[in-house]
Amino acid sequence: MTVTLTINSQRVTVAQGSTILEAARSAGVSIPTLCHHRDLSNVGACRMCVVSVENARGLQTACTTPVADGMAVNTESQEAREARRFVLEMLLSDHPNDCLTCEVNGECELQDLAYECGVTWPEQRGARHAYEVNPDPNPFIFIDRNKCVLCGRCVRACGEVQNRDVWNFASRGFKSKLVAGADQFMLDAGCESCGQCAGYCPVGALYDKMSLGVARANKVKKVRTTCSYCGVGCSFDLNVRDGKIVRVTSASDAPANGMALCVKGRYGYDYVHHPDRLTRPLVRAKWLDATQRDGRLASGEWQAATVAGKHARRSAVSGQQSAVSSQPSAIRDQEPVPGLQSPDRFIQVDWDSALDLVARRFAEVKREHGSEAFSVFASAKCTNEENYLFNKFTRQVLGTNNIDHCARL
């Protein structure tokens, strides 16, 4: 069933059970909101969406009031505009005036609403909160209760999206504040450090601790990608500055996960730029020695590669030009990696050399021990196409059915 109403003298037809806010947005009419989010339940906490409804007593919150047939709504009445300005002035009167250094400057919803409604910073009106900034030892989530506008988004996100119910409000009136559990540290209250609360916070009262002081929204390029940690296929936006990932933000239109991310997906990106990350193939020295029998490396070239690699590292430290540049690329790429003793030390090689070695060893094992000597594990981190090819390679090339799949590999 449908319902027909008028919004600012515009005739609108929507499904029965819709709210005034949903009806207005379907008609292209903008109503300011602060506590509302399309993924969460509506509570009407901020009172920014108040509108005038004909024959109704007082102003109505558009996000919680259901439409009715024949209803007449005015979103821009003098009474509604004055009420919104008053709400904004009250919020700003107890809000830190640190926009110049705030992490969410430029993407703060309170800032946007003040601009939209023409509200400037009000004069001091009574007491102000002075909470300790970032008192919680959680390694991923930063909290500044002085910025909190008590919209309740984090409370609903934690309960409705993550099903943890870590956040809630304590006390009443001016003393109302956001607390974890029974006013505990987040982790003591059962927090999973998923960061949903920070993702839904409109003002930066909750923020990603790893991204503090790194880059603002207008300084980063957002790149949509898929999480590599498991097979769910969560999508999110990498916030990239100067070729480096500085933050991960949720993508509300992600098909598998929406705004939801786990702690690994949201905060486990530092491995990308970690110095220990392997970016080139490593082969044990004993296998490179074996290739000499096939004439791949001439006699003495392995020793030459070792000496060249050591000299390259010394030259890099002293700033001198490396003598390794005069070596052929096949030898220059085989720079010994320190930390292991020959013959088990790892050597950096080019991809062709590594793949040739693997193919040759596979052929030797199959010839000497048969196909049943192979055991293969696929991974949920691979795409369906990659796993299909892996399965085909195992059965048709290696000639074995010993293939399994691990969701956490």
Sequence positions of predicted segments:
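N-terminal cofactor/phosphate-binding cores enriched in small/glycine residues
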Residues: 9-69, 78-83
